[in-house]
Amino acid sequence: MHRVDYHPAPHLTGGHLLGTDSKGADIAAYLFGGLQVNIKAALIYLPIVYSIGLTLGMFMGYFGGKADLLTQRIIEVFSQLPFLFVVMIMADFVPLHLRGMFLILVLLSMFGWMHITYLVRTATMKEKTREYVAAARIMGAGPFHILARHILPNLTGIVVTLLPFSIAAVVLSLASLDYLGFGLPDTYAGWGRLLNDGLSKLSSPWVVSSAFCALVITLMLVTFIGEAVREAVDPRRHTYYE
């Protein structure tokens, strides 16, 4: 089907608060749709990467041994790969009509769990030397009971601290893939796609500025909200902005 390009209308024109893009779509509505996509993506992405990262990290830190060393080597190899290019190559092999949100997020999740695993592993190694873990062992608690009932609750601070960075990572990754044309189909509202549209038509600066501001404001809000939640969970460690 031949694509019809329109001249983007500026803001406050024809009832469009932020104007329109080259396809005649209302930018404000498109940004709101992109926000919904990012929220849905985060709700899918976060459980996947944190389930993998927490499980592997706790097992590596608690049991150690050859399995720990092997997993570390695997993580080191994968962490050296430019994950965005790998995801682009893998996504390019998938037909566009099959390239849905879940598939893209699974591809991103293949790399998103590794830094979580390392931090959880280090924290678990520290926690397993605590007196409460030794007391649980004396009372006959098994390793899985100790991990689930004693060590996992003490990892809450790490999880809360990492959450805003994980959300920012998935938002930026989706925007980058959409900008490069390897992201979600056109049926999804993508801020990266809007950014690409704006950069290709710099004579209409409100298009690119709207997408850029949406990304910056969202990432700043995620960071500050995450910091506030972290301070509420762990008030002993405060970060002050001057």
Predicted regions and their residues:
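Transmembrane helix boundary and interhelical loop/hinge segments in multi-pass membrane proteins
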Residues: A123-Y132, A228-R236
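Transmembrane alpha-helical segments in multi-pass inner-membrane proteins
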Residues: L96-L103, S166-A169, D186, G190-I217
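Short alpha-helical transmembrane interface motifs in multi-pass membrane proteins
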Residues: V37-A41, L56, D68-Q72, G100-V106, ...
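Membrane-embedded alpha-helical bundles that form the substrate/pore pathway
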Residues: V37, L69, E76-F83, G112-H115, ...
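Gly/Trp-centered helix-boundary motif
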Residues: M1-L54, M58-F59, K66, Q80, ...
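Generic hydrophobic transmembrane alpha-helix motif, especially the helices
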Residues: L17, D21, A25, I48-G53, ...
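Non-cytoplasmic
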Residues: F85-I89, F93, L105, S109-H115, ...
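Amphipathic cytosolic juxtamembrane alpha-helices at the membrane-cytosol interface
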Residues: A25-K40, G64-Q72, M125, T129, ...
